[in-house]
């Protein structure tokens, strides 16, 4: 079940062209990319592209944030000194707090929806893909997370003058991208990265809230938890923005696994530097649940031998 962000859009017509009934069980799952959506969060769009009926937009309006696109106007916009609305799409505004209260922000909201799903599942087995949109641009954090960190907390960028003077032609092209040019400037990094760090801290806090909820529901000791990300962000390292190439900043993402079974006690709390991939996660979960990963359909390898 999906709660949160996905880049995949349901496509009924494609399923029909494949000769599959889009309303069949297989067709529904395929056009939802294998998910049963509990709540889809397909990302924030500028006003011209906004769907006013998104569940999060409806929720914000119910809390008094009146707008055709409350997500954009409140969750990802700040208020200037003269009451003007400052867009989170402009990096210079990352130092301001979002107009939305923290308890109604994207991260808090999706954590609540995840807990709703777990609570509603009762004693039935469940599998949840909780996908947070933050930390991600628009770089706009709600108070108090917008100013928990200062420019002095920002680490020096991992880049060299040689990289800038003599880049590979492909990297040279990416260095000309607007984001790369922006993050090449120290002033931009010192404005954006503290907000980015605040958004990471907010994720930490709400995951802590979710862990306590699982404990209260009696499910901490029978739930495998996998924490990871789809990619990193250069934020100025190697004179780049975004996440397009193969440096560690882009592809070396976190992977933390909580395996509550006694077989994992020997490795609990340890770190492993061997390279694994996202495609290894589905075989890992299948084997942990007692199944046999179908090798003719799955490319990855189970990570249980590293955990047990």
Per-segment meaning from a language model:
Residues 1-100:
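Catalytic-site neighborhoods of secreted/periplasmic enzymes
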Residues 2-13, 131-136, 161-169, 227-232, ...:
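Short, solvent-exposed turn/loop segments enriched in Gly/Ser/Thr/Pro and often Arg
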Residues 5-17, 93-111, 115, 221-226, ...:
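Polar, surface-exposed loop/tail segments
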Residues 14, 24, 28-35, 45, ...:
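C-terminal cap/loop subdomain of S1 sulfatases and analogous C-terminal strand-loop tails that border
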Residues 87-101, 174-194, 260-267:
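Short glycine/proline-rich turn/loop motifs
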Residues 105-121, 182-223, 288:
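A long, amphipathic alpha-helix that forms part
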Residues 115-160, 176-191, 234:
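Active-site His/acidic residue clusters
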Residues 138-144, 148, 212-270, 274-277, ...:
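Histidine-centered active-site microenvironments of extracellular/periplasmic hydrolases
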């Amino acid at each position: 079940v999906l709660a949160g962000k996905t880049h995949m859009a349901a496509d009924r017509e494609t399923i029909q062209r494949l000769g599959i009934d889009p309303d069949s069980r297989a067709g529904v799952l395929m056009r939802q990319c294998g998910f049963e959506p509990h709540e889809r969060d397909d990302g924030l769009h500028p006003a011209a592209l906004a769907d006013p009926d998104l569940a999060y937009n409806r929720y914000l309006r119910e809390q008094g944030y009146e707008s055709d696109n409350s997500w954009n106007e409140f969750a990802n916009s700040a208020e200037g000194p003269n009451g003007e609305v400052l867009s989170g799409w402009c990096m210079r505004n990352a130092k301001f707090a979002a107009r939305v209260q923290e308890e109604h922000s994207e991260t808090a909201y999706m954590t609540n929806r995840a807990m709703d799903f777990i609570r509603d599942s009762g004693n039935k087995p469940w599998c949840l893909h909780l996908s947070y949109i933050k930390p991600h641009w628009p770089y706009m954090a709600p108070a108090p997370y917008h100013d928990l960190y200062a420019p002095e907390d920002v680490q020096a960028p991992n880049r060299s003058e040689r990289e800038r003077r003599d880049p590979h032609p492909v990297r040279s092209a990416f260095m000309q991208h607007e984001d790369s040019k922006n993050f090449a400037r120290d002033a931009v990094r010192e404005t954006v990265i503290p907000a980015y760090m605040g958004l990471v801290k907010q994720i930490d806090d709400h995951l802590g809230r979710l862990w306590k909820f699982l404990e209260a529901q009696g499910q901490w000791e029978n739930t495998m938890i996998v924490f990871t990300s789809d990619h990193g962000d250069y934020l100025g390292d190697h004179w780049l923005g975004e996440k397009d190439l193969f440096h560690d900043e882009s592809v070396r993402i976190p992977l933390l696994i909580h395996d509550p079974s006694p077989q994992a006690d020997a490795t609990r709390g340890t770190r492993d530097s061997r390279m694994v991939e996202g495609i290894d996660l589905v075989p890992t979960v299948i084997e942990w649940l007692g199944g046999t990963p179908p090798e003719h359909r799955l490319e990855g390898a189970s990570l249980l031998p590293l955990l047990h």
